[in-house]
């Protein structure tokens, strides 16, 4: 830690400009007001595309970093307002249109629904009987489980929260306007990283976790304990009664009678009746022990509140971010992190790239925790919700990571200054880019040929009737011994490291089978040759995605092919006329290609997850204790061939969506077709050139002129970049809708 005399550094002050930008509805009502060229209005149809492309590209509107920073800050509040409106809508649907109260009274027999379709042209068929006499669309968002864990016991509480969401949205909209138009922070406020770290760590993460821990202890725990014991929701005291009447808490948790004395006398063990370290899952609900998660949030709060006091601001004590970075030198890293502080305080693209990469990775980790350690009551036995949550978080994580590649490339083009990065880590990585990319390329080739080759071998052997020569658990075994070792360590180690824990952190590693209402919530996931094969496909597709994105970043400014690439900008179709073979080299094009491989990677991940869980985890526990899995454990033998994936997964499990007509799942059947159509539509944009369309348009314009109905705005074909953007958007949208319909029709029909 660095300590400095107080006189050495100026005091941190919150400085703002008053009324920097007038509020003008007249200006906002003018399309393209942010750009001088666009503000003149449309002359060609390209205008509407440029309007959308540049509306949020603040760099193109001004070169003033302070103004850009203010616009981003204000936009954050707008984003939060949208999130609050969305959340409010979710809670309102739960209050007004759902069977939440009926589900709460009987969560194992009644399914969650929060939408009832009006039968205008016969859509009433979509309202399935979800139990308890309620007819509606079954939802798979998991909100009911979250609300149960939070302590919601009636619709009125959901209404109040929905109104609270709208109030927060209004506050956010006001804050966004206020901090741009009335009191706008100066640039030094945005660049004051130590204060920002302290506030974000101690305030947002620390106090946020503390507030949630408080809610869990005082509201969630008592309500959930009574619900678990079978008390009817209507008979449970309301949250404020538990908060205001200590005797009600003391009945459930005797340590409450001692108040806060044990805290100050360091006799913390007294609180172990509501702050526990049990491990595993609650056998009644199949969710994490709520007393464990309350303990977790309290510990996280303490950790982050301490972390929020680490950085030096006005008191001359603590860490300086710049000094930490510049002291970070290794024997082979030259100037180390010198210069990175300047990059991260002047390039928001660099900052965003790092944050997106971190948050994307974290989101993927969340996807895995949601099934391995299901946090909410009864979530684990709702297989459709489990599959939806996994798929959702995987895709969100994938998009964020591709976004990291995008903003990394934009940083390199717009913000990177070679003169300020001499022999530091970033400079050294860029100078080593050929070695990095060529090695990564070799890894991709190796993984691609070998992983695919194993499947080709298996298909060939099975086709020739030689099962004894296949790679499988019953012939030539390729066991994932390292993964099995990790599983074993995680199962055995807590016996020594956490002797008081009742179970391992996750039953996915090993241990018992947790069943709720005769359905498997979680059990040990055994790994074998089939998993070894598909994991190497995962490794291959992930490495190709990384190769594309990293090449886009490292070669964004220059390459041997186009030494002045940085002058052409982040997105350009080719290096001008008369120079063939220079197309698809811009930073933008690498993002474009990266999106396809991200989608490719994650399709295999979610297919693997879906089939593996149906085969080896999800199912019914029979009276004699044996488990009947949904697909009867067919993953190990069927997924080791490409034919098996097509026949026993894609085709066999698509039966539910293909045969859905005439049932409550019929909308998924239509969506399945519509998704395929949108996907096919994308190929029209991806497989044709701009010239073809421009020729066609000119014929159509000629016909309009003949009929004297020529448009005043000149029609133009989409640019090459625009065509690719439309293509990849429809490709992904079509694929996502198709997968959504396939997964939901399948899992809803087998529950």
Curated annotation (Swiss-Prot):
PSI electron transfer chain: 5 chlorophyll a, 1 chlorophyll a', 2 phylloquinones and 3 4Fe-4S clusters. PSI core antenna: 90 chlorophyll a, 22 carotenoids, 3 phospholipids and 1 galactolipid. P700 is a chlorophyll a/chlorophyll a' dimer, A0 is one or more chlorophyll a, A1 is one or both phylloquinones and FX is a shared 4Fe-4S iron-sulfur center. It is found in: Cellular thylakoid membrane. It holds the Pfam family PsaA_PsaB. GO terms for molecular function: 4 iron, 4 sulfur cluster binding; chlorophyll binding; electron transfer activity; magnesium ion binding; oxidoreductase activity. Its main location: membrane. Its EC number is 1.97.1.12. [4Fe-4S] cluster binds at residues 574, 583. Keywords: 4Fe-4S, Chlorophyll, Chromophore, Electron transport, Iron, Iron-sulfur, Magnesium, Membrane, Metal-binding, Oxidoreductase, Photosynthesis, Photosystem I, Thylakoid, Transmembrane, Transmembrane helix, Transport. Phylloquinone binds at residue 693. Chlorophyll a binds at residues 684, 692. GO terms for biological process: photosynthesis. It is a multi-pass membrane protein. Belongs to the PsaA/PsaB family. HAMAP family: PSI_PsaA. PsaA and PsaB bind P700, the primary electron donor of photosystem I (PSI), as well as the electron acceptors A0, A1 and FX. PSI is a plastocyanin/cytochrome c6-ferredoxin oxidoreductase, converting photonic excitation into a charge separation, which transfers an electron from the donor P700 chlorophyll pair to the spectroscopically characterized acceptors A0, A1, FX, FA and FB in turn. Oxidized P700 is reduced on the lumenal side of the thylakoid membrane by plastocyanin or cytochrome c6. This is Photosystem I P700 chlorophyll a apoprotein A1. It comes from Gloeothece citriformis (strain PCC 7424) (Cyanothece sp. (strain PCC 7424)). The lineage of its organism: Bacteria, Bacillati, Cyanobacteriota, Cyanophyceae, Oscillatoriophycideae.
